């Protein structure tokens, strides 16, 4: 028996975030960082970032490079990236990318 069409659903947010994942991953690798996904992608895209090579850029520069993927070749002065601290010394950058779609990038170090 075929599935009822109403039973087949797609999380549109997950599909939206999945479409940009490879660009984010490659950007992080170019900056000397490794990234991994965490969470359901139901509301935002939670990314765990860790410096992977000795020459990795700072966390702030990684975030700026990722923002360039959505904002062209330069960071807009009014682009709102908010930084915060979480438990166990974790730092997080929240990047609004469109409407209520966000990237939350977390790291245990700022790699200065």
Where are the regions a protein language model picked out?
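Catalytic core of pol beta-like nucleotidyltransferases
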Residues: 1-43, 50-112
């Amino acid at each position: 028996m075929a599935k009822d069409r109403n039973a087949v659903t797609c999380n549109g947010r997950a599909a939206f975030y999945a479409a940009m994942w490879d660009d984010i991953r490659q950007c992080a690798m170019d900056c000397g960082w490794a990234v991994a996904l965490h969470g359901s992608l139901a509301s935002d895209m939670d990314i765990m970032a860790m410096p992977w090579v000795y020459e990795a850029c700072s966390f702030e520069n990684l975030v700026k490079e990722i923002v360039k993927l959505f904002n062209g070749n330069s960071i807009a002065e009014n682009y709102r990236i908010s930084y915060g601290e979480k438990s166990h010394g974790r730092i997080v950058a929240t990047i609004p990318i469109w409407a209520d779609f966000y990237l939350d990038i977390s790291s245990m170090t700022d790699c200065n």
